[in-house]
A protein has these predicted regions:
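Catalytic histidine-centered segment of alpha/beta-hydrolase-like enzymes
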Residues: 223-237
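Conserved alpha/beta-hydrolase catalytic His-Asp/Glu region
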Residues: 117-118, 133-187
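Acidic catalytic loop of the alpha/beta-hydrolase fold
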Residues: 199-204, 228-229
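Active-site loop/oxyanion-hole signature of alpha/beta-hydrolase fold enzymes
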Residues: 41-80, 240
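Short beta-strand/loop motif that positions the catalytic acidic residue
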Residues: 188-189, 195-197
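Conserved HGGG/HGGXW glycine-rich cap/lid loop of the alpha/beta-hydrolase fold
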Residues: 4-52
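Gly/Ala-rich beta-loop-alpha elbow adjacent to hydrolase catalytic centers
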Residues: 82-91
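Flexible "cap/lid" loop of the alpha/beta hydrolase fold
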Residues: 96, 102-133
């Protein structure tokens, strides 16, 4: 795991958690717009830190490592946690941690991907396909349709894939996504949590229902015309929405 710090050391603290096959560089266009006001901590999970020496295991394991970092470096306090796609798993575990205090959290694209009896078959097939994507930097047309993504947006994401991603890490991220919503997260009635997603994303209705069981005050925001992960490709809009959420 790698955590990079940017911006105003005296500003509000913000941590960014990336999506699948990505690393901290998924936010490279966003960070310059945040640096003046915020102290930004951009994370690369195990298996996606470009070293080839780490392996992604579970969302809970990543959350535990982040909690230890926040305890040590930030006195256990974080003002805002922003998680994209894969990052939403560690985020919900981190929010439930008794050792850290997170004031606000945004889950971007936390799709419900549990397909029940098909999960085992998916775990046999999809990690291999996504591993190929990581190394060939190519996304087939069916995957673009599934994500609601444009070719141009996907090319931007493909350029940000780090080196040395293993099949073991990819398989672990798929398991994390398929089974995330089977976890019974503690109810946090006063938690300031938002769920953001693109209009073209699928599998969000069930996700929102499950998230509301943990966060009864959940704020839901749908972005018209966007697919999965596309909000990050519009950094100025994302920053304005972050600032608006901060004022709620």
């Amino acid at each position: 795991m790698e955590i990079k710090r940017f911006g105003n050391i005296e500003g509000k603290t913000m941590m960014l958690l990336h999506g699948n096959l990505m690393c901290w560089q998924q936010f490279e266009d966003l960070i310059p717009l945040l640096e003046r006001k915020f102290c930004v901590y951009a994370v690369s999970f195990d298996g996606f830190d470009g070293t080839g020496e780490t392996t992604y295991t579970t969302a809970r394991d990543q959350a535990d490592k982040l909690a230890a970092y926040i305890e040590k470096e930030l006195d256990g306090q974080l003002d805002l946690l922003f998680a994209e796609s894969l990052g939403c798993g560690p985020a919900v575990f981190l929010k439930a941690s008794p050792t850290v205090q997170i004031d606000r959290m945004i889950l971007s694209g936390p799709e419900y991907l549990d397909f029940g009896v098909l999960n085992r078959l998916i775990l046999k097939v999809m990690p291999q396909k996504q591993y190929r994507t990581a190394h060939e930097k190519y996304m087939p047309a069916w995957a673009l349709r599934f994500m609601g993504q444009t070719e141009q947006g996907m090319q931007t994401m493909l350029r940000r894939i780090p080196d040395h991603i293993s099949l073991e890490s990819v398989r672990a991220t798929w398991a994390a996504g398929l089974y995330l919503y089977r976890t019974d997260f503690p109810v946090q009635p006063d938690a300031k949590v938002a769920c953001w997603y693109g209009e073209k994303e699928g599998h969000m209705k069930k996700a929102i229902q499950r998230l509301r069981t943990a966060y009864p005050s959940l704020i839901v925001r749908c972005f018209p015309g966007f697919g999965h992960g596309e909000l990050i490709l519009h950094p100025a809009l994302l920053v304005s929405e972050l600032e608006r959420f901060w004022l709620l």
